[in-house]
Swiss-Prot record:
Its cofactor is FAD. This is UDP-N-acetylenolpyruvoylglucosamine reductase. The lineage of its organism: Bacteria, Fusobacteriati, Fusobacteriota, Fusobacteriia, Fusobacteriales. Its EC number is 1.3.1.98. It is an enzyme of class 1 (oxidoreductase). Its main location: cytoplasm. It comes from Fusobacterium nucleatum subsp. nucleatum (strain ATCC 25586 / DSM 15643 / BCRC 10681 / CIP 101130 / JCM 8532 / KCTC 2640 / LMG 13131 / VPI 4355). Cell wall formation. Coiled coil: none annotated. One of its GO terms (molecular function) is UDP-N-acetylmuramate dehydrogenase activity. Residues 17-180 form the FAD-binding PCMH-type domain. One of its GO terms (cellular component) is cytosol.
Length: 281
């Protein structure tokens, strides 16, 4: 493992916001996680993947950040089973599926997170969720043991999994794919994302979860908040469920945007929006 102190955590978040951290540990291989938790000096541990949905405070964080981005192996187990380590990203998995002529999660193409992060929150897009093709996951559990859990033994819902409640670390996921890679679907999703999502400035993607039967972006738009700027943070014109860093946004700028959105939507629609991003203070 590699250990760093006083790292600028803005370099580990797609939002490019964040103060310094007490310690950053980069795992490789996965078994090193046992040593991390057995070290009594390591308290207040936070697991970090690719940082695509993490907003860090600007202040010093007295935490131990454990980064899994080097755990990125993708292995074909045969019989259409593929084991993917937590730090692998969807681009690499999609390329692997194309090479093997596998199909099943093409609609997720373009989501910038790690597999571990997507599994943790049951990430999804365009009618597909990551758990649709998962048969089992490998976790580091609350007893500091590495174990495999079958999908049917897990509680999974919209942007929610039992993993969050039990604070497990996802180490890998095993998928069962079908045959017949859908290149046309990948192309369609790529074009949809480019047309609907603001990809030219730092952001964390979808900021709020969609309430049941509705869309956060629609609610925010109906509140007249498209394009709203606070400090150096902006509610995107192109997709109002995205918050953009215009260059030098602070943690407070972004929190003030989130507060404004939640207050406005609650007052106009009586709906309490819930963040899809993770905020680390």
């Amino acid at each position: 493992m590699k250990i760093f102190t006083n790292q600028e955590m803005k370099n580990y978040s797609n939002m490019r916001v964040g103060g310094k951290a007490k310690k950053l540990i980069i795992l490789e291989p996965k078994e090193e996680i046992i040593d991390v938790y057995n070290d009594k000096e390591n308290t207040d541990i936070f697991i970090l993947g690719n940082g695509t949905n993490i907003l860090f405070t600007d202040e010093y964080m007295d935490k131990i950040f454990v980064c899994t981005k080097k755990l990125n192996k993708i292995e074909d187990l045969g019989k259409n089973l593929v084991k993917v380590e937590t730090g692998a990203n969807l681009k690499d998995l999609t390329d692997f599926m194309k090479d093997k002529n596998y199909t099943g999660i093409e609609s997720l193409f373009g989501i910038p997170g790690s597999i571990g992060g997507l599994v943790y929150m049951n990430g999804g897009a365009f009618g597909t969720e990551i758990f649709d093709k998962i048969v089992s996951i490998e976790v580091f559990d609350e007893n500091h043991q590495i174990r495999e859990i079958k999908k049917e033994d897990l509680k999974v819902a919209y942007r929610k999994t039992e993993i969050q409640d039990k604070n497990w670390l996802v180490l890998s996921a095993t998928f069962k794919f079908d045959n017949g890679f859908d290149a046309a679907r990948v192309k369609e999703i790529k074009e949809l994302r480019e047309s609907k999502h603001p990809l030219d400035k730092p952001s964390l993607g979808s900021t709020f979860k969609n309430p049941e039967g509705d869309f956060a972006a629609r609610l925010i738009s109906e509140c007249g908040l498209k394009g709203t700027i606070i400090g150096n943070a902006q509610i995107a014109e192109k997709h109002p469920n995205f918050v953009l860093n215009l260059g030098n946004a602070t943690f407070k700028d972004i929190i003030d945007i989130l507060t404004l959105v939640k207050k406005s939507v609650l007052e106009k629609f009586g709906i309490k929006l819930e963040e899809e991003i993770i905020i680390v203070r």
